[in-house]
């Protein structure tokens, strides 16, 4: 009996944690390209808040915050035709570059501006000339909506009603439902 107890005690002690092996700490950074979260350094998870000021009144709101890892954010807004706000935020990217974004959000949507954000390509000269020509013609009272206008195209209207749909009464009633299943 003593032998069984000693063997069990040795087995429990030998089955303990392995020295030098540390279980990895996983951090979920939210949805995105990385299916298991964005890899991030430990400092980012535990960054202290250096400044956090906020005020909410019946006229609107404003807030400002700073963290020790270089993240800064500020915004102010009022309630008029929905919420109209403007603000900015900045942070240091994984590549060490400082990224800054200024934005407005109102009835026209969210509009962000930043040096690192993509910009649309320029409008081709031919399109610009065409828009200017259309504006001049409209100012002169010429309205050319193109050669096709469904409401003024009598031939298209006549062809559409040439063969009216007729109900076929000699067809048996369909007792089968959707995809052939009986109800």
UniProtKB/Swiss-Prot annotation:
Record-annotated Chitin-binding type R&R domain positions: 58-121
Pfam families named in the record: Chitin_bind_4
Leader sequence residues: 1-15
GO molecular function: structural constituent of chitin-based larval cuticle
Keywords carried by this UniProt record: Cuticle, Signal
Designated name of the protein: Cuticle protein 2
Assigned GO CC terms: chitin-based extracellular matrix
Signal among keywords: yes
Protein's UniProt keywords contain Signal: yes
